Amino acid sequence: MRHRKSGRQLNRNSSHRKAMFSNMACSLVRHEIIKTTVPKAKELRRVVEPLITLAKTDSVANRRLAFARTRDNEVVAKLFTELGPRFAQRAGGYTRILKCGFRTGDKAPMAYIELVDRPEVEAAAE
């Protein structure tokens, strides 16, 4: 029975899940928008939102905690210099999930997960 067991298994063992969500969190922080399946996006929220909350108060201890969870100095620097100050006035809800159809190979439901208040990129086609 799976009573009171939170989180999705996603047909992976625990170390694979941990590595996958660490990599996805780094990609989301670096690019501010990524495309993935809907269940992975919903689980990724549970990893990224605490990281951004941690980055709102800049301290050595918080930077070490963020590095322990991401293992990437570039991502930690962006978290504490850009994202922490950007979301300083927002109490949670830093990500948005936008459904975008189905994958061609297996019809898996796909979604974009992005950081809210993301700076808009000017279209080069104009």
From Swiss-Prot:
InterPro entries for this protein: Ribosomal_bL17, Ribosomal_bL17_CS, Ribosomal_bL17_sf
SUPFAM superfamilies, sorted: Prokaryotic ribosomal protein L17
An example Gene Ontology biological process: translation
Pfam families for the chain: Ribosomal_L17
GO molecular function: structural constituent of ribosome
UniProtKB keywords: Ribonucleoprotein, Ribosomal protein
Listed PROSITE patterns: RIBOSOMAL_L17
A cellular component term, taken from the record's GO annotations: cytosolic large ribosomal subunit
Subunit organization: Part of the 50S ribosomal subunit. Contacts protein L32.
Record-stated family: Belongs to the bacterial ribosomal protein bL17 family.
Listed name of the protein: Large ribosomal subunit protein bL17
Native species: Aliivibrio salmonicida (strain LFI1238) (Vibrio salmonicida (strain LFI1238))
Phylogenetic lineage: Bacteria, Pseudomonadati, Pseudomonadota, Gammaproteobacteria, Vibrionales
Gene: rplQ
